[in-house]
A protein has these predicted regions:
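Extended hydrophobic secondary-structure segments that form protein cores and membrane-embedded regions
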Residues: 11, 45-51, 98-100, 121-122
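Conserved class I S-adenosyl-L-methionine
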Residues: 39-53, 70
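S-adenosyl-L-methionine
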Residues: 72-123
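Mobile active-site "lid"/loop adjacent to the S-adenosyl-L-methionine
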Residues: 125-168
Length: 168
């Protein structure tokens, strides 16, 4: 199990089975370049862009495949939360490093160090381009579920703005 896995109030709580599916799919992709065998162990290194407050991808990747990770995020609270989870779990402490991205305009700059190499990068980007698009998606979902009775629809999910929407 994972000790101290707690997400700060108001942060995105990821559905773990779907996130595990992403990691297993990534493992299958890595196997294509490894004679059909999923690479295991600390020689495999991944970069999780937008690690979030939950650190879910590094947790699953380390547990299932013993991979090493760098997790980056533009949110200091998310990095603090993920770093705390890592520190409380010996199986993560030596193989996961959380780094704060000081510039929301950059993805790799300030995160990837000179001569640092990764076998893969992964990202679970925000689903919406704007708060308005997120609200429209919630309204559509409620209508499709037969709940359109004219009442005001709130978002059917939680999270910080940078977890939920971004331009592009």
């Amino acid at each position: 199990g994972v000790e101290g896995w707690d997400i700060p109030d108001g942060y995105l709580c990821p559905p773990i089975p779907g996130r595990a599916d992403y990691i297993h799919h990534l493992a299958d992709l890595l196997a294509f370049g490894n004679d059909g065998t999923i690479p295991l162990g600390h020689s495999v290194r991944g970069l999780d862009v937008g690690v979030g407050a939950s650190c879910v991808y590094p947790i699953v990747g380390c547990h299932e495949y013993r991979w090493r990770f760098v997790g980056s995020d533009i949110d200091a609270v998310a990095i603090e939360s993920s770093s705390r989870i890592v520190a409380l779990n010996p199986f993560l402490a030596e193989v996961v490093e959380c780094r704060l991205q000081p510039s929301s305009a950059d993805i790799f700059r300030n995160i990837i160090q000179p001569d640092e190499r990764f076998d893969f990068t992964l990202c679970n980007p925000p689903f919406h381009a704007s708060p308005q698009e997120a609200a429209a998606g919630s309204q559509r979902k409620f209508r499709n579920l037969g709940h359109s009775r004219g009442e005001k629809v709130v978002l059917n999910f939680g999270g910080q703005a940078n977890e939920l929407w971004c331009e592009g």
